């Protein structure tokens, strides 16, 4: 039985996906994808599923996601799901389809928050006192 493990990251959210042979079920934190709320999150998570089409009919994907907020978790989950589908099927045309649609389906977003600097640390990394000319 073929099993594939993939990881998707976005800011502090980390999603770990496990793909194995099955009947096309996708579960996120042990909840079916169809029950995800709000609707915007569900629709964004459905994108790789719709793009994959019939290639997903014999794959079960379980995703565990931790950290971050709901949007970061959604982005990390999309990346992990996209990687799992491509790696499990091994189809290059599917990989090209994902990359042409949205690169973040296969590549994690490397941007992170900027660390605060020592001067006005609570105000942010680039905070300065306002300069007055009069």
Curated annotation (Swiss-Prot):
Sequence ranges of Basic residues compositional bias: 118-134
Record keyword Ribosomal protein present: yes
Region Disordered, residue ranges: 109-134
Matches recorded under HAMAP family: Ribosomal_uS9_A
Protein name: Small ribosomal subunit protein uS9
Annotated family: Belongs to the universal ribosomal protein uS9 family.
GO annotations of cellular component type: cytosolic small ribosomal subunit
A single GO molecular function term of this UniProt record: RNA binding
Protein's UniProt keywords contain RNA-binding: no
Any one of the GO BP annotations: translation
InterPro entries per UniProt: Ribosomal_Su5_D2-typ_SF, Ribosomal_uS9, Ribosomal_uS9_archaeal, Ribosomal_uS9_CS, Ribsml_uS5_D2-typ_fold_subgr
Lineage top rank: taxon: Archaea
Matches recorded under Pfam families: Ribosomal_S9
NCBIfam families tied to this protein: PRK00474.1, uS9_arch
Keywords annotated in UniProt: Ribonucleoprotein, Ribosomal protein
